[in-house]
Amino acid sequence: MKKEIIIIALVFALGGSAAAIFLKSGWDKKVAPPQEETGFWENEEKTKLTIENVEFEVEIAQTLTERTKGLADRTDLCSQCGMLFIFEADNYHAFWMKGTFIPLDIIWLDKNWQVVDFTAFAQPQAGRPDEELPIYRPKTPARYVLELPGGTVEKIRGFKVGSQVELER
């Protein structure tokens, strides 16, 4: 009996330590963009950007909670609207359409705001089990991801891998 109590106490102590480390790690902190932009996104909820002379107003998703939620549960998105996902580092940031009700174009950007890859017209997957949902990944590591209404990239004259995205400052 004493042995069981000691084991249970040890499990709780280790679990509490792990939880404290996790909570202190800042898992939901605002993400810092590249050094030259430090502070640019702080307290920002939206920004304007331009791709091939077409302007968009996009919401900024910079915390883990915001990035996880993304555009899920939205039933519409204006033609000049979208969401910009800010990440700390370049990576093969993967996206899926869980809980998303509208088609989206997913655009991956490098740290210099250049398009490195995109998926046009990712379709909603209502009713499909999570394990059957397609996962969309870039072919090249990216720092930022931009989601726009499905079909937008086809309408932007000159849009391609290599297109430059310009931010309003």
Label every model-predicted segment.
Residues 2-7, 19-169:
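Compact, glycine-rich, soluble single-domain proteins
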